Curated annotation (Swiss-Prot):
CDD domains: DnaJ, DnaJ_C, DnaJ_zf. One of its GO terms (molecular function) is ATP binding. PROSITE patterns: DNAJ_1, DNAJ_2, ZF_CR. The J domain is necessary and sufficient to stimulate DnaK ATPase activity. Zinc center 1 plays an important role in the autonomous, DnaK-independent chaperone activity of DnaJ. Zinc center 2 is essential for interaction with DnaK and for DnaJ activity. A zinc finger (CR-type) spans 137-215. GO terms for biological process: chaperone cofactor-dependent protein refolding; DNA replication; protein refolding; response to heat. Signal peptide: none annotated. It comes from the Bacteria. This is Chaperone protein DnaJ. CXXCXGXG motif repeats lie at residues 150-157, 167-174, 189-196, 203-210. It is found in: Cytoplasm. Gene3D superfamilies: DnaJ domain, Heat shock protein DnaJ, cysteine-rich domain, Urease metallochaperone UreE, N-terminal domain. Binds 2 Zn(2+) ions per monomer.
Length: 374
C-alpha cells in the first residue's frame, strides 16, 4: 500500500478539499482501526492512512508534498526527524465521535468540566391597555411570580463560607462514560446530577438552587404608538438562573382593548360621525373628538351623502419611534329626524314643492335607483 502516494492511500484526487480528505480518512480509519478488525495487515494499513492524513490535512506540509513529490518528501522528513508515527493509534472514540458528528448529525460532549450554572427561563406577561394609553405611551406596574436570585448565598447555592467542590465521580465533567464494545456511552453523573460539582452544605433558604420564588413588582415602559400584539422584551427580567446562571428575559405581550368610538386600522383611526340632514344638505362645521383629547373642527361640504368619508390628516394613532401620525377617517351618518314640529313639517313641505326632479315616476328616479348598485 505504501507504494502509492498519499492521495492514492486515501482514495482522493490531488484537488480534494479538506472536507473530502477528512471524509475519506474517517471512512478508512473506521475500516482499518485495530480495535475494530482482526485483519492481518490492519495495523500497517492504519499507520499508512494516518501518515497520509497527517501530511495532507496540514496545508504547509501538503504544499511541500505536492512540490517535492512522494519520495523526496519522505527523504526530507526522515532527515528532519519527521514522519515517524511509531505505534500511535488515535482513540477509536475520537474517530467514531467525528464520524457520527459528520455523517449522522450527532454532536460530541466536550471532556472539559461543564459549568453548573444554568440560565433562567424566559417569562411571558400579557398586558391589556386602552387605546389612549397606546397612543400616549404609559408606565405600567405589573406583578408576577418568578424565581429570583437568593440574597443569602448570592446565587451560589452554598451556605455562606462553604466552598463548592468538584465531583470526584465524574471529575467535574458532569457525565460518566461506560464502554460497550468499541462504543462509549455517556450518561449524566448520578452523584452530582450532571452539575460537575458537589455542594456539601446547601443554602437553607434556596435549598442549594441559588434562587427561590417570590412575587415580583416591576415597572414597564409602554412606548407611544404600540400596536395590538406587540411584544416588548425586558432583558434579564425573567427567572433568575440556577446557581448564579444568567437570568432569562421577560416578554410583555400587548393587547389593546376595543374602543367605544374608534376602530384601529394600522396607524389610522375610523369613526362614524352623526350629522343632521340639514348640515348634510347645506354644509357646515362641527366639532369632532380626537384621540389625544379635546376636539377639532371638521368642515362638512354641502350635499354630503350618508356614508361619505372625510379625512382628518395627522389625527390618527402615533407610530413607535416616529414623529409621523396616521389619519382619522370620519364616516358620515346622516340622521333623519323622526319627530317634527308643525313648523318643521311646513318648511319641509315647502321644500318638497320647490324641489326639482322629485317625481318618482319619471326616468331619472329609476336611473338613480340603478346607480345605487354600481
Amino acid at each position: 500500500m505504501m507504494s502509492q502516494n498519499y492521495y492514492q492511500i486515501l482514495g482522493v484526487s490531488k484537488t480534494a478539499s479538506q472536507a473530502d480528505l477528512k471524509k475519506a480518512y474517517l471512512k478508512l480509519a473506521k475500516q482499518y482501526h485495530p480495535d475494530t478488525t482482526d485483519a492481518k495487515d490492519a495495523e500497517k494499513k492504519f499507520k499508512e492512512i494516518n501518515a497520509a492524513y497527517d501530511v495532507l490535512k496540514d496545508e504547509q506540509k501538503r504544499a511541500a508534498y505536492d512540490r517535492l513529490g512522494h519520495d523526496a518528501f519522505q527523504n526530507q522528513q526522515s532527515r528532519g526527524g519527521g514522519g515517524n508515527h511509531g505505534g500511535f493509534h488515535p482513540d477509536i472514540n475520537d474517530i467514531f465521535g467525528d464520524f457520527f458528528s459528520d455523517f449522522m448529525g450527532g454532536s460530541r460532549r466536550s471532556s472539559r468540566p461543564t459549568s453548573a450554572k444554568v440560565r433562567g427561563s424566559d417569562l411571558k406577561y400579557n398586558l391589556t391597555i386602552n387605546l389612549e394609553e397606546a397612543f400616549h405611551g404609559i408606565e405600567k406596574n405589573i406583578s408576577f411570580s418568578s424565581a429570583v436570585k437568593c440574597d443569602t448565598c448570592h446565587g451560589s447555592g452554598s451556605e455562606k463560607g462553604e466552598t463548592v467542590t468538584t465531583c470526584d465521580a465524574c471529575s467535574g465533567v458532569g457525565v460518566t462514560r461506560m464502554q460497550q464494545g468499541f462504543f462509549t456511552i455517556e450518561q449524566a453523573c448520578h452523584k452530582c446530577q450532571g452539575n460537575g460539582h458537589i455542594i456539601k452544605k446547601p443554602c437553607k433558604k434556596c435549598h442549594g438552587m441559588g434562587r427561590y420564588h417570590k412575587q415580583r413588582n416591576l415597572s414597564v415602559n409602554i412606548p407611544a404608538g404600540v400596536e395590538n400584539g406587540t411584544r416588548i422584551r425586558h432583558t434579564g427580567e425573567g427567572e433568575a438562573g440556577i446557581r448564579g446562571g444568567n437570568s432569562g428575559d421577560l416578554y410583555v405581550d400587548i393587547a389593546i382593548k376595543p374602543h367605544d368610538i374608534y376602530k384601529v386600522d394600522g396607524a389610522h383611526l375610523h369613526c362614524k360621525l352623526p350629522i343632521s340632514f340639514v348640515n348634510a344638505a347645506l354644509g357646515g362645521e362641527i366639532e369632532v373628538p380626537v384621540i389625544e383629547g379635546g376636539k377639532v373642527k371638521l368642515t362638512i361640504p354641502a350635499g354630503t351623502q350618508n356614508g361619505d368619508q372625510l379625512r382628518l390628516r395627522n389625527k390618527g394613532m402615533s407610530k413607535m419611534r416616529s414623529t409621523i401620525r396616521g389619519d382619522m377617517l370620519t364616516h358620515m351618518h346622516v340622521e333623519v329626524p323622526k319627530n317634527l314640529s308643525k313648523r318643521q313639517r311646513e318648511l319641509l313641505e315647502e321644500f318638497k314643492k320647490e324641489s326639482i326632479n322629485e317625481k318618482e315616476n319619471d326616468g331619472s328616479f329609476f336611473n338613480k335607483m340603478k346607480s345605487l348598485w354600481s
